[in-house]
């Protein structure tokens, strides 16, 4: 039981597990054992010899727990570990079974404000009532009552053993000694006999008991370690003491200087002020905020800004007129190209009407040459009606106009035939529609 509590305490404190060493004495038929436990480098020894090895180890673990719980830094931790596992309730139940009394009965009373209740617990054991310290909840109040009952019974057992002339057997368990002391106390106080009433009697004796678990644990000082609560607080060295004293002296001088400066007379304000470090007057603002820059946004499709009027020799812009940089360097505005509309003709649409031109064929008579208007536009040179070529022995007359007229006639017929092709295609489409 005590070994388990000591092991749990070591695990919560981030220490190595406790190690036990046993010493055996006496003959083989009646051996005696004495154990020592090493807890975080400290050695705790059982106060007496025990008949079994297990009892000796439990006795050494109990000594270690009692020693650790009595120390200042570890006071609340050891007591809390013993409380959370319900050790004291189990011990009281075992004492009640040894005495032959009914099991312990716990009662809690609530007091205080509604949002901050206070619970006080009492436990009745063998007709005796024990009252514990107040707590913030019922469960802790019952544990405090069991703790107070166990501490009172231990003190009663020590007082009884010291008053008895005959020495007791040192091999007996602590529970047996406490049960015997409780029986003697009941007989002495006439508790549970026919002459006394059946109502429970409060425990009359008052013993000096250490508060194994304070109701409101105080925070440990800054010099102690939270991880290693069993290390005693170190005493400050001489150098640290001198530095602390110097710091406190400087603080007092600073306070006095500030007070004298604030309450000095008006005629003494212009005297030399006392020296005060600048860190005392350090402002909260560590720097100036950057200036705010406002940018003017020009829409994309807006009209370009008006250019400034041209400066002549006589007229100049005043120096006070400010032209923004965006207006000075305005981007060029591009104008979209004109829209061109093209007429699309469907494939199966009817062909557009064709303008028919009638060409006038030239009429050539004998001895004359007539040229149409088309021939006149082409400005073809006109040859004389007849040419006389003199040849030896004979004269030959050639009429070139006849040749030219025949050529022009052939050209006109070729044009008429080419212009008549669309007309035949149109006639074909009309025939298909019909």
Curated annotation (Swiss-Prot):
<dbReference type="GO" id="GO:0035196">
    <property type="term" value="P:miRNA processing"/>
</dbReference>
<dbReference type="InterPro" id="IPR014720">
    <property type="entry name" value="dsRBD_dom"/>
</dbReference>
<feature type="domain" description="DRBM 2">
    <location>
        <begin position="87"/>
        <end position="155"/>
    </location>
</feature>
<protein>
    <recommendedName>
        <fullName>Double-stranded RNA-binding protein 2</fullName>
    </recommendedName>
</protein>
<keyword id="KW-0677">Repeat</keyword>
<keyword id="KW-0943">RNA-mediated gene silencing</keyword>
<dbReference type="GO" id="GO:0003725">
    <property type="term" value="F:double-stranded RNA binding"/>
</dbReference>
<comment type="subunit">
    <text>Heterodimer with DRB1 or DRB5. Interacts with DCL1 and DCL5.</text>
</comment>
<comment type="function">
    <text>Binds double-stranded RNA. May be involved in RNA-mediated silencing.</text>
</comment>
<dbReference type="InterPro" id="IPR044451">
    <property type="entry name" value="AtDRB-like_DSRM_2"/>
</dbReference>
<feature type="region of interest" description="Disordered">
    <location>
        <begin position="402"/>
        <end position="434"/>
    </location>
</feature>
<keyword id="KW-0694">RNA-binding</keyword>
<dbReference type="InterPro" id="IPR044450">
    <property type="entry name" value="AtDRB-like_DSRM_1"/>
</dbReference>
<feature type="domain" description="DRBM 1">
    <location>
        <begin position="1"/>
        <end position="70"/>
    </location>
</feature>
<dbReference type="Pfam" id="PF00035">
    <property type="entry name" value="dsrm"/>
</dbReference>
<dbReference type="GO" id="GO:0005737">
    <property type="term" value="C:cytoplasm"/>
</dbReference>
<keyword id="KW-0963">Cytoplasm</keyword>
């Amino acid at each position: 039981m005590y070994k388990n509590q000591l092991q749990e305490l070591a695990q919560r404190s981030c220490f190595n597990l406790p190690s036990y060493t046993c010493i055996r004495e006496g003959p083989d038929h009646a051996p005696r054992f004495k154990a020592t436990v090493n807890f975080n480098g400290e050695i705790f020894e059982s106060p007496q010899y025990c008949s079994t090895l297990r009892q000796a180890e439990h006795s050494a673990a109990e000594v270690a727990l009692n020693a650790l719980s009595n120390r200042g830094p570890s006071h609340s931790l050891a007591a809390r570990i013993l409380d959370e596992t319900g050790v004291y309730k189990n011990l009281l139940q075992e004492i009640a079974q040894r005495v032959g009394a009914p099991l312990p009965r716990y009662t809690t009373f609530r007091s205080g404000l509604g949002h901050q209740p206070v619970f006080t617990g009492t436990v009745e054991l063998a007709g005796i009532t024990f009252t514990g310290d107040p707590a913030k909840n019922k469960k802790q109040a019952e544990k405090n009552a069991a703790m107070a009952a166990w501490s009172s019974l231990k003190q009663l057992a020590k007082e009884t053993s010291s008053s008895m002339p005959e020495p007791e057997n040192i091999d007996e368990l602590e529970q047996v000694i406490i049960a015997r002391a409780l029986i003697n106390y009941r007989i002495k106080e006439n508790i549970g006999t026919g002459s006394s009433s059946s109502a429970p009697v409060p425990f009359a004796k008052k013993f000096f008991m250490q508060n194994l678990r304070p109701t409101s644990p105080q925070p440990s000082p800054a010099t102690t370690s939270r991880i290693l609560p069993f290390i005693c607080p170190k005493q400050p060295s001489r150098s640290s003491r001198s530095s602390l004293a110097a710091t406190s002296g400087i603080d007092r001088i600073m306070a006095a200087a500030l007070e004298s400066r604030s309450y000095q007379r008006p005629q003494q304000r212009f005297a030399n002020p006392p020296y005060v470090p600048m860190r005392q007057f350090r402002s909260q603002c560590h720097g100036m905020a950057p200036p705010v820059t406002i940018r003017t946004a020009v829409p994309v499709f807006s009209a370009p800004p008006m250019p400034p009027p041209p400066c002549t020799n006589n007229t100049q812009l005043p120096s006070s007129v400010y032209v923004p940089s965006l207006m000075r360097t305005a981007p060029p505005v591009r104008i979209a190209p004109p829209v061109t509309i093209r007429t699309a003709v469907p494939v199966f649409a009817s062909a557009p009407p064709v303008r028919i031109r009638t060409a006038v064929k030239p009429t050539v008579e004998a001895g004359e040459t007539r040229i149409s208007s088309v021939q006149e536009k082409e400005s073809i040179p006109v040859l004389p009606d007849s040419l006389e070529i003199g040849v030896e022995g004979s004269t030959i007359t050639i009429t070139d106009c006849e040749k030219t007229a025949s050529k022009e006639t052939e050209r006109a017929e070729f044009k008429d035939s080419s212009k008549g092709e669309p007309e035949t295609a149109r006639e074909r489409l009309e025939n298909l529609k019909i």
